[in-house]
Amino acid sequence: MEKKRFVLVHAVCHGAWSWYKVKTKLEAAGHCVTAVDLAASGINMTIVEEIQTLMDYSKPLLNFMSSLGSDDDKVILVAHSMGGIPAALAADIFSCKISAVVFLAAFMPDTRNPPAYVFEKLIRSIPREEWLDTAFGRYGNPDCPLESALLGPKFMAKKVYQRSPIEDLELAKMLVRVNPLVTNNLAGARSFTGEGYGSVTRIYIISGEDNILPEDYQRWMIRNFPVKEVMEIKDADHMAMFSKPKELCALLLEIADKYA
């Protein structure tokens, strides 16, 4: 298979570290892989209070995309969970540098509504008690507050990592950080463009046993903004890169072969 370039975008409170299994497997298959830490994530030194906009949160990803020259191969952008919104922003700005965007159990914006619409729609429907020990906070202007979260260990065990190896859950407990939530106040009202983000090939990978982004909501997002292809990992929890890494990598290699 021809060498392809993957760029991996992590979930809220996580970091590039969450892709360690997938990165290893894709590189072993001969591909070039970059896993990005978004702002205030992983080893990125930004603190949450410095993040006032979606651009701020997405800056490391945007900087990487900007660094790619015209002679570089187009990338396959793979976004997980809330990372779907920064990935959509990158696709809107750098559509000419992207061969496909893969949404893995990810929030997938459309080109009609504000960027955070798909996140707000789900998040506001979940009763606070279902978040268990997750800690929420507010910062910034009291008249237009920004929101943050730190996923709790009980919540991760029950809702996020319930089918993943216990070692990966323990890793996450050690490494998760407070992150901004991509709400309307952070992302703004301006929707992504049809000429940019809307022009890029999109593929959605459904996690069939996802307890935080339910399958029916994943399918609603696909109906809301149809994609080129829908794939599914039936027994994956929200963290398919941990619970079903082989199956996920097989799909990513298939996508690379078809669309890159």
From Swiss-Prot:
SUPFAM superfamilies: alpha/beta-Hydrolases (SSF53474). GO terms for biological process: jasmonic acid metabolic process; salicylic acid metabolic process. The lineage of its organism: Eukaryota, Viridiplantae, Streptophyta, Embryophyta, Tracheophyta. Coiled coil: none annotated. Keywords: Hydrolase. GO terms for molecular function: methyl indole-3-acetate esterase activity; methyl jasmonate esterase activity; methyl salicylate esterase activity. Pfam families: Abhydrolase_6. Putative methylesterase. Its EC number is 3.1.1.-. Belongs to the AB hydrolase superfamily. Methylesterase family. The active site is at S81 (acyl-ester intermediate), D210 (charge relay system), H238 (charge relay system). This is Putative methylesterase 19. InterPro entries: AB_hydrolase_1, AB_hydrolase_fold, MES/HNL. It comes from Arabidopsis thaliana.
